[in-house]
Design a protein with these regions (language model features):
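Acidic, metal-coordinating catalytic segment for phosphate/diphosphate chemistry
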Residues: 1-36
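Conserved hydrophobic "DFG−1" position in protein kinase catalytic cores
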Residues: 39-40, 48, 113, 131
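Conserved Nudix-box catalytic region and its N-terminal flanking loop in Nudix hydrolases
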Residues: 41, 45-82
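A short coil-to-beta-strand element that immediately follows conserved catalytic motifs
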Residues: 87-95
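Active-site-adjacent beta-strand/loop module that shapes the phosphate/pyrophosphate-binding cleft
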Residues: 97-120, 130, 148
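NUDIX/MutT-family hydrolases
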Residues: 121-153
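Charged phosphate-binding loop/patch that engages nucleotide di/tri-phosphates or the phosphate backbone
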Residues: 150-163
Length: 163
């Protein structure tokens, strides 16, 4: 349904919905489960995205909420396809972080994998999606994304070397 809206109106709806969701979480304080995806291309670069509704000037890892009973790897594959138009293979959950988010307890499942596809963001939810070399991440990246990539890279030195 939202896809029928003009892109600027769609982005406005996403911003309002995100604000309402954060307000609701501050009241309800739910336990949430989501994923962040570290998708590397064959050259070892990682995919980052810029959301239209949350800090659009910042680069972040792709990801999103997990449905009840959904495996982290399946959620990561779904989110990467939705946000960047890329298929993730060799998906593996390598850690779970619990962080506070607007009063909610947010369990972030960190999933890594490989994609050989060029990103195709919809320019609605996702304004941009690009691959970056680990040693040349953009200045405008969130600290959380930078830390998660560094942690993953330290554990997977062979996987993130340029060919």
């Amino acid at each position: 349904m939202l896809a029928r809206l003009p892109a600027p109106l769609h982005r406005l709806v996403l911003k309002v919905a995100h604000s309402l969701r954060l307000a609701w979480w501050s009241v309800r304080r739910p336990e949430l489960h989501g994923c962040n995806v570290i998708a590397a291309d064959p050259q070892g670069r990682v995919l980052l995205v810029r959301h239209s509704y949350q800090s659009p000037e910042k680069w972040m890892l792709p990801g999103g909420g997990m449905a009840r009973g959904e495996r982290a790897e399946d959620a990561a594959c779904r989110e990467l396809l939705e946000e960047a138009g890329c298929r993730l293979v060799e998906a593996k959950c390598f850690a779970v972080e619990v962080v506070g988010l607007a009063g909610a307890s947010n369990h972030i499942h960190l999933v890594s994998g490989v994609t050989a596809e060029e990103p195709r963001p919809d320019c609605r939810e996702i304004l941009a999606a690009e691959f970056f070399a680990i040693d040349a991440l953009p200045d405008a990246i969130t600290q959380t994304a930078r830390a998660r990539i560094a942690w993953w890279a330290a554990q997977n030195p062979a996987q993130n070397r340029a060919s």
